[in-house]
UniProtKB/Swiss-Prot annotation:
Any GO BP: translation
Organism: Symbiobacterium thermophilum (strain DSM 24528 / JCM 14929 / IAM 14863 / T)
InterPro entries: Ribosomal_bL12, Ribosomal_bL12_C, Ribosomal_bL12_C/ClpS-like, Ribosomal_bL12_oligo, Ribosomal_bL12_oligo_N_sf
Homology family: Belongs to the bacterial ribosomal protein bL12 family.
Annotated function: Forms part of the ribosomal stalk which helps the ribosome interact with GTP-bound translation factors. Is thus essential for accurate translation.
Protein name in the entry: Large ribosomal subunit protein bL12
Chain's gene name: rplL
Superkingdom: Bacteria
Length: 127
């Protein structure tokens, strides 16, 4: 049996506490962390190709009101509906554009909010 196979057999017989201690000792001995995924080491070689999937994995989005357009009243109504703000707060947000209307929401919620604002005549950006 090879050394690697022997090590695997030993690891199979270890408890969770022993495995935790092994991980910590391994990190201290070799100056590495177990949290770093292998794919990160390959990222610099992939260059821009690896950057594109990272952007697609984004889970939180901001809806930014860039310009309220000509129909501010309709935009204020939509902002109130989306945020639950009072009339004055919603008006201040619309008048102070560009400002975030919703922050850290899912892609579906961000797209739905952006669509409502666009229907009201606003210029919107989802980041």
């Amino acid at each position: 049996m090879s050394k690697a196979a022997e090590v695997i057999e030993i690891i199979k017989g270890m408890t969770a506490l022993e495995l935790k201690e092994l991980k910590e000792l391994f990190e201290e001995t070799f100056g590495v962390t177990a949290a770093a995924p292998v794919a990160v080491a390959a990222a610099p070689a992939a260059g821009a190709a690896a950057a594109a999937p990272a952007a697609e994995e984004k889970t939180e989005f901001d809806v930014i009101l860039k310009n309220p357009g000509a129909n501010k009243i309709a935009v204020i109504k939509v902002v109130r509906e989306l945020t639950g703000l009072g009339l004055k707060e919603a008006k201040d947000l619309v008048d102070g554009a560009p400002k975030p209307v919703k922050e850290k929401v899912s892609k579906a919620d961000a797209d739905a909010a952006a669509e409502k604002l666009k229907e009201a005549g606003a210029e919107v950006e989802v980041k």
